[in-house]
Amino acid sequence: MASNKPKPLWKADDQQARLTELTAHSDEPAKDNPLRRDVRSLGAILGQVLVEQSGQDVFESVEELRRLLIEHRETVRRSPEQASSPKLMLQAQEIVSRMDLSRAYQVTKAFAAYFELTNLAETNHRKRRRRAAKLDREHPPLPGSFRGTLLRMKESGISAENAAAALRQITITPVFTAHPTEVARQTVLLKRRRIAQQLERLDRLPLTAEDAEDCENNIRAEVTSLWQTDEVRLAKPTVDDEIRMGLRYFRLSLFDALPKIYAEVVESFREVYGLDLDENTLPNLVHFGSWIGGDRDGNPLVKPDCIRDALQMARALILREYLNDVESLSDRLSSSRRQTGVSEELLSRLQHYENTIAGVHLAWGPHNTTESYRRFLSYMFHKLQQSRESAGAPAAYRDAREFEDDLLLVNSSLRSNRGERLAQTYVDSLLRMVRTFGFHLHTLDIRQHARVHAHALKELGPELKGDARSAETKELLDTFRAIAQLKRTYPAHSIRHYIISGAESENDVLAVIRLAKAADVQVAGSATDVHGDDPGLMPVPLFESIDSLRAAGSVMRRLWSDPEYQPLLDSWGRWQEVMLGYSDSNKDGGMFTSTWELYKAHRELHHAAQEYGVKLRLFHGRGGTVGRGGGPTHAAILAQPPGCFSGQIRITEQGEVLNWKYADPVLAEWNLE
């Protein structure tokens, strides 16, 4: 008997044709066939779920509305003069007006779900096209890629040595911010992620009918679960909730994406210039920052305790990741001294740990004496556990450099005993993680408005010994005291920037320095790079109105010539960070005026920095949407005034776009690249 079982929506009748679509050149129409198939199939699944969950009537209402609106769109596309013809739109409005509240909610939810699924399909297609571009070496590389950039440099006559020297000057720091209207729940985001994983699985060829059916069933189950799930939070997220939402992207994608960035750099140099770079000698090209838990400007819910919570949660996350990685290393590094050698340095430190640290659980048993790496990693695991539970515990690592030192011993021992491949595959990526994230994961910026500092100085008097009468001033002083204490409790690099919103004069910067010193905050840096003991606390003026942008160069000239400020500049290695506000300048002067004034301010700040021997690092406070100063980050970097880029740049990554940029490792890697 013939089976009535329907054919899987994604079934590949011709595997070769499917492969041709997936690898099509960027100028071939077939490249979009997989996207169309995904959108069509996801829409069909949503329709099935809609009938099952809400009935045929709701499905027909959605379909009728969809048909009318598509017909209206196509009519206008063919005949623009008919855009004013209301016939089709009136029919759609009539259908909506007849709905009761329950039906309207279900129809709205159906359209929202459709657009969510379409977005997932488009995101998967971006990943698909990125893979295809890597296969297609005959066509020009994607704009913004390492390979494309190096090719342009080579064609411009820049040598491999000069290109490598330029690379060593670069540091990019995405700074995550909270999204005040973020209502999407993590459970919903994770369901979307699982659907995306199934879409990616459907691109793996050969795709059997059974595999296609299994993926389809998984997607159908997730869509059903999505339909039965509350889409948004029923209560406003707390500051701690916002902190957790920002941290989840490290676990979802950034820990995986980071080593791939450096591998892509090395491969691109090898392919374009024929130059073999040692990945271990590359500088840290990427660091991360956050405002979540430290942004007090206009947010009364961000208390000094929130700063402590943000640092604690970030530290706990990165230490948990290191524990997982060391455990994974222990599984893999089973090299025995009966088969290969181990360095004397590693054996000596292992002996020291065995003599001085008690109560260590040896993962592979106390009698396993020949597998020295595993024994050593057991002690490293124990020391990390102690660090996570209490930074002051006797057996804890005092800082990330001690942990890195142990990893370097393992790395060196492997390389000197015919284990170079093991070191490259298993240890190098963890070393890069430690050099990037330390024990603090990211720097937490503190932000407050200039008028709050001015009001506090007025209350406290010239000697800063008056009583803080207002709650606002009391909280401000508590914040500075918390900064002083937390920079001693946590890695000092956890807090190193203080953003001054609404900055208009050099006095706004000097006010922060006075308040910080009065609270015993170490403002001056004790070293000039990330390996120093304490980088201090650099005040960062944020120029965000049109008038303040026009005055920015003059303000910084006066600040840099101030005798009180000169020693601080020296302590920071002559670096100065200045922030430019895109969103507020857009609101103040409009998009065109804002863009032009930002350009001029950047150019003037650069000229002023050259005059005073200052190394300028700009912090671009860009919104997520175009209306808030958002847009393609790569294009924004290219649009900077010629000759005005120091190699270091910080850019806000707004909460409303974090999910679309960093929820997936492939997209996170591409965004960072």
Where do the language-model regions lie?
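C-terminal amphipathic alpha-helical interaction region
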Residues: 2, 6, 10, 18-26, ...
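Often metal-dependent polyanion-binding catalytic scaffolds in large enzymes
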Residues: 2-462, 472, 630
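Carbohydrate-active enzymes and regulators
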Residues: 64, 77, 85-86, 123, ...
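Short glycine-rich or small-residue beta-strand-to-loop segments that form or flank ligand, phosphate
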Residues: 112, 411-413, 498-499, 539-542, ...
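Beta-sheet entry/capping signal
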Residues: 283-285, 289-291, 299, 431-432, ...
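Expand to "…catalyze enediolate/carbanion chemistry for C-C bond making/breaking, isomerization
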Residues: 293-296, 476, 480-481, 598, ...
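Catalytic or ion-translocation cores adjacent to nucleophile or general acid/base/metal-coordination motifs
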Residues: 302-333, 519-673
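Active-site cores of enzymes that catalyze phosphoryl transfer or operate on phosphate-rich substrates
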Residues: 372-382, 386, 419, 424-427, ...
